[in-house]
């Protein structure tokens, strides 16, 4: 009987980990959407909201990391569960970095005078692709969809290419 209760508790802990990870992913998606909107509108109020959200994303990262460590130490997961917990640890590191980058963009909006070019298609495409990649990454993790995960990884090159175009445009004054 105790084994059944402990197994149920363990399952609940894994579900809670997934829910927290999904919430963190959604927070990152929102940060990117808001960053792009704040850039377009030069909205310093929205920029401040993004910076606050960046701090919250960092708190989420620490909370999830703590949950993962407790699961590893107290439950000693094996096989698929161990892979899930290990993957969660890697994912939260990347999500936190995304949150920090969104906060950095917001800080630029607050401090730098710039003209936003509405025709900056690479920037728009980069924002949209990044948001979709986060969504797909979360889906691949929760559904354990290896094919979707691999396809998402391949799309990272597209975002890198778009970033280079954006950077080139900014440096040349064309954005």
Regions found by a protein language model. Give the residues of each.
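Cytosolic, long alpha-helical scaffolding segments
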Residues: 1-175
């Amino acid at each position: 009987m105790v084994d059944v209760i402990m197994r149920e508790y363990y399952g609940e802990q894994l579900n809670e980990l997934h829910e927290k990870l999904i919430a963190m992913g959604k927070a990152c998606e929102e940060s990117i959407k808001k960053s792009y909107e704040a850039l377009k509108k030069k909205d310093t109020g929205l920029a401040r909201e993004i910076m606050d959200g960046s701090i919250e994303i960092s708190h989420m990262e620490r909370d999830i990391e703590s949950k993962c460590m407790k699961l590893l130490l107290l439950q000693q997961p094996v096989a698929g569960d161990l892979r899930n917990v290990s993957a969660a640890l890697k994912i939260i590191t990347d999500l936190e970095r995304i949150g920090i980058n969104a906060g950095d963009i917001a800080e630029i909006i607050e401090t730098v005078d710039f003209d936003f070019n509405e025709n900056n298609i690479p920037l728009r495409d980069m924002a949209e692709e990044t948001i979709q990649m986060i969504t797909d990454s979360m889906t691949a993790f929760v559904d354990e969809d290896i094919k979707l995960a691999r396809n998402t990884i391949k799309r990272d090159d597209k975002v890198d290419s778009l970033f280079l175009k954006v950077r080139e445009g900014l440096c040349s004054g064309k954005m």
